[in-house]
Amino acid sequence: MSLTLRVTTPLAAVLEEEGLASIRAEDASGGFGLLPGHVDLLTVIEAGVLRFRRPEGPWHFCAIRGGVLRATGGRLVTVACREAVPGEDLARLEAGLKRQAEAADQAARRARGEQVRLHANAIRSLMRHLDRAPGADLSGIVEAFE
C-alpha cells in the first residue's frame, strides 16, 4: 500500500504524486509523519515545507503557505493551501521563495506608493472644487490634512 499526495491552491492543482512511502508536515502541535494506512486526519498546517518520498527514494519538497491537510482512507492525503511551490532541491526551493518574497514586497511598496498618490490627488481635487463653491469654509478641512 502507498500514499497519494495532492496539493491544490485556489488557482491550480500544483502537485499530484502517487506511490509515496511517507509524508511529513507540521501543524500547531509540531511535526508529524503520515504512512500508508494512517487513520483519517484533518489538521491546519503551518507555512513551511511539506516533505514526501517514495520507497527507497530521496525526499522531495513542496513549500506551502499554510493550509488544510486531510488524510483519508489510509491512502489519500490532500493539502489545500493559498500558495504552493514544489521543488526537488531544498536550497534551490528556498532561494526561489526568497526571490518571490522580495518581488511581492516590491510590488506591495509600489502599490502603497500609488495609493498615497491617488489619495493626495483626490484631496487636491476636492479642495479645488470646494474652493470654487461660494461661501465654502475650508479651514477645518485644511487643518485636518496638515
Swiss-Prot record:
Instruction: Indicate how the chain sits in the lipid bilayer.
Output: Peripheral membrane protein
Task: Give the top-rank taxon of the lineage listed in the UniProt record for this protein.
Answer: Bacteria
Report a single Gene Ontology molecular function. Answer: proton-transporting ATP synthase activity, rotational mechanism
Q: What GO CC annotations are associated with the protein?
A: plasma membrane; proton-transporting ATP synthase complex
Which InterPro entries does the annotation name? Answer: Alt_ATP_synth_F1_esu (IPR024037), ATP_synth_F1_dsu/esu (IPR001469), ATP_synth_F1_dsu/esu_N (IPR020546), ATPsynth_dsu/esu_N (IPR036771)
The annotated subunit structure for this chain is: F-type ATPases have 2 components, CF(1) - the catalytic core - and CF(0) - the membrane proton channel. CF(1) has five subunits: alpha(3), beta(3), gamma(1), delta(1), epsilon(1). CF(0) has three main subunits: a, b and c.
By sequence similarity, the record places it as follows: Belongs to the ATPase epsilon chain family.
Name listed for the protein in its UniProt record: ATP synthase epsilon chain 2
Q: Which organism is it from?
A: Cereibacter sphaeroides (strain ATCC 17023 / DSM 158 / JCM 6121 / CCUG 31486 / LMG 2827 / NBRC 12203 / NCIMB 8253 / ATH 2.4.1.) (Rhodobacter sphaeroides)
